């Protein structure tokens, strides 16, 4: 044996075995520690401690969630409280009113003038003042000023105008976004509707003039939605009797809308009608004009058709008048200013159709004579 070689080999093996032994020992110790820890953790005292700890953690998480939810709710309520105020920058302007009121001194008329400069519409101003009065941290002198200001505004404003403006505000905001219009304009239209004594055709025509013929259908949807909301409101703008009359007017307006759609779509479905005039707005204007002045049908048709009529044959004229007669006959007589006006209109159209038919026959005879 080579001296030293055995001890070297033995040493390396010993190191290897020693390392293995230490690993095994450490592993065994670790296992024993885990077993001991598990035993301790499974003891009744440990279980109670773990339960208390987990409960504390859950309580802390719930408290954090509740605080965040309460904060979001307060922020949402602050925003929602001014949702029916249609004036731009309502919240900053409301704070400005509160700041002005908080300054001691000054006459009520001065406060009123400044408040109206910020909120020109009385419904907006009343909503803002009512909301400010809900605050619990107001000084007594500030609260009394706000109450006096609110009372003054309510007394000076027509109740129907005030309540209607408040009750239709959310609908005005919603439809304002849909139509890309200022909601205050829609609110004004609803107020005008519930107080107007004009004929339904005039009301419908005013909407077209104000909003454009493309929006006429949606504007009526807004009026209907606002009226139903107003009826269900705790502080409605009208009496039951008045609402009954308004619902009848609404029915007439919806009937007018249906007649309008049928009249225009039927006429524009024919190519020779489009040859006369292809504009939807022109035929809509014609129908509304006929409801108000059917005796002028000849001149009204001439305005719509114009010189294009000269380019068409007598046969096409007669065909057009026959179709036009049918669409006018389909209009409910109750939509005319006077119901008997529809029959007078139809009589005039029959006369015009007879003349056109005679011209058509004469034209055919001339054609036959030329061929023979």
From Swiss-Prot:
One Gene Ontology CC term in the entry: outer membrane
Chain residue ranges for the region called Disordered: 1-47
Superkingdom: Bacteria
Any GO BP: negative regulation of protein secretion
Gene3D superfamilies with a match to the protein in the record: 1.10.150.630, 1.20.1280.240
UniProt function note: Involved in the triggering of intracellular events that lead to microbial internalization. These events include increase in calcium level, redistribution of actin microfilaments, and changes in the normal structure of the microvilli. Encoded within the type III secretion system (SPI-1 T3SS), it is essential for the translocation of protein effectors into host cells. Forms a complex with SipB and SipC in the presence of their chaperone SicA.
Protein name: Invasion protein InvE
